[in-house]
A protein has these predicted regions:
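Beta-rich, blade/repeat-based domains predominating
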Residues: 1-22, 41-59, 66, 71, ...
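Glycine/small-residue-rich hydrophobic helix-like segments
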Residues: 122-188
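A short, acidic, flexible beta-alpha connecting loop/helix-capping segment that sits on the rim
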Residues: 179-180, 194-196, 204-209, 215-219
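Short coil turn/linker residues within repeat-based beta-strand modules
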Residues: 30-32, 79-82, 124, 160, ...
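A short beta-strand motif characteristic of beta-propeller blades
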Residues: 1, 33-42, 82-88, 130-136, ...
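A short loop-to-beta-strand structural motif that recurs across blades of beta-propeller domains
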Residues: 23-25, 72-75, 116-118, 162-164, ...
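Short loop/turn segments immediately following beta-strands, especially the blade-tip
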Residues: 119-126, 214-222
Length: 228
């Protein structure tokens, strides 16, 4: 990629979609990159951060904007590359994304002012509803999201070195915390991997490595649509 790569995802044909610089790229099986989206004419992308597919091939992309500039937004890229400004909020550095297990909400990490997770209803026609607060995470910089098969939401935090689990009944609980910052070291995105989706992995920006966590949980399967 031409610049630092933020988040990435894969479609059902094996193409990769990655956020780099001010664009979203599509990468084929030979490693050839093409520009998939630069935003819209009126709203060009500034700092696309993380992409996630819905089941129909719509690609939601958080554009974090500038750190502390409160100019973030969320784009939706339709199959083929046509791009819409899907939501102009949250503005305070929208970061990691995930689709709810039933496909009815887009969950969004908001890293700043104040750090939290929100969700935005996905209306039947695909437009954005009114955003809702899910949970606040004081004194942190949340970054990544993932659901497990039981509907629990996992939230990785760049600061401090922690992963939290949230559900409506038990609230927010700490799953992993590394006060030394050695095994985790500024975790960013997280994902459930493996044949049974029972390996939780985090990418760690602080020491440029990947950490595996044995947490006795399996991930909810992601969407891998065929995108023409």
């Amino acid at each position: 990629a031409p610049q630092f790569v933020g988040g990435l995802c894969q479609d059902g044909s094996g193409f990769l979609y990655l956020c780099s610089g001010d664009k979203v790229y599509r990468c084929d099986q030979k490693g050839v990159l093409t520009v998939y989206s630069e935003g819209t004419y009126d709203e060009p992308m500034i700092a696309p951060n993380y992409p996630v597919f819905d089941e129909n091939g719509g690609l939601y992309v958080s554009d974090s904007g500038g750190w502390g500039d409160d100019n973030g937004k969320i784009f939706k890229i339709l199959p083929g590359g046509e791009t819409q400004l899907w939501s102009d909020t949250p503005k305070e550095f929208p970061n990691g994304l995930c689709i709810s297990p039933d496909g009815s909400y887009l969950y969004v990490v908001v890293s700043l002012n104040s750090p939290r997770v929100e969700r935005i209803p996905i209306d039947p026609e695909g437009s954005a509803g009114i955003r809702e607060l899910v949970v606040e995470i004081p004194n942190s910089v949340p970054d990544g999201l993932a659901f497990d098969s039981e509907g629990n939401l996992y939230i990785s935090c760049y600061r401090p070195d922690s992963i939290f689990r949230f559900n409506d009944d038990q609230g927010l609980e700490t799953v992993v915390h590394d006060y030394e910052g050695t095994m985790m070291a500024a975790p960013t995105n997280i994902a459930f991997c493996g044949d049974r989706l029972n390996d939780l992995l985090s990418s760690n920006l602080g020491r440029w490595h990947i950490t595996r966590y044995d947490i006795d949980a399996c991930g909810h399967p992601l969407n891998y649509p065929i995108v023409e």
